[in-house]
Amino acid sequence: IDLLVAADGAEALRAAAARQGATPLGQDDLEALRVLAGIARFGADMDPSRLPMEAGLTRAAISFGKGCYTGQEVVLRATVRGHLQRGLVQLEVPPGAAAGTPLTANGQEVGALTSVADTPEGRIALGYLRRAHWKEGERVGAGAGEAVVRKVIVEDGLPG
């Protein structure tokens, strides 16, 4: 949780939380938790070229019952077709893998990493993969090493 408090009360709140066993988290810790939770972040895992469904945001970001909105035609087309060509997945990645690292299979580029974090569970990343590779346990090349799909996050064009 995020707590917002007046500056003059921040130290008292920190001390009270510490007495209850809470520990402060830094930005790297928060990033690791986000990546482990499979939550896409705009500017890292999403940009205007991505469909909300590709990033696993169908239920959180789209109302299929509302009237007109920017991008409605593209979202509707993907929904009617019933499938997407690429989508967000969570992967275990090798040391040295970073955001922007291409993901490959059979010598072909099939995706790229968008966020990478060191976590208690290892080096974990979010990235986009082509549809044929949306399988937990799927192995793809990641730079000089290999990445393994841990979780498929993409929602395949399903109405919310």
Language-model features: locations:
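Short, conserved active-site entrance elements at the starts or edges of catalytic domains
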Residues: 33-57
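Short, charged, solvent-exposed linker or helix-capping segments at domain edges/interfaces
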Residues: 14-15, 46, 138-139
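Acidic-enriched, low-complexity/disordered segments with a strong bias for Aspartate over Glutamate
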Residues: 2, 8, 28-29, 45-47, ...
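Acidic, low-complexity central loop/insert segments
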Residues: 1-40
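Glycine-rich, small/acidic residue-mixed loop/short-helix segments
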Residues: 50, 55-72, 76-160
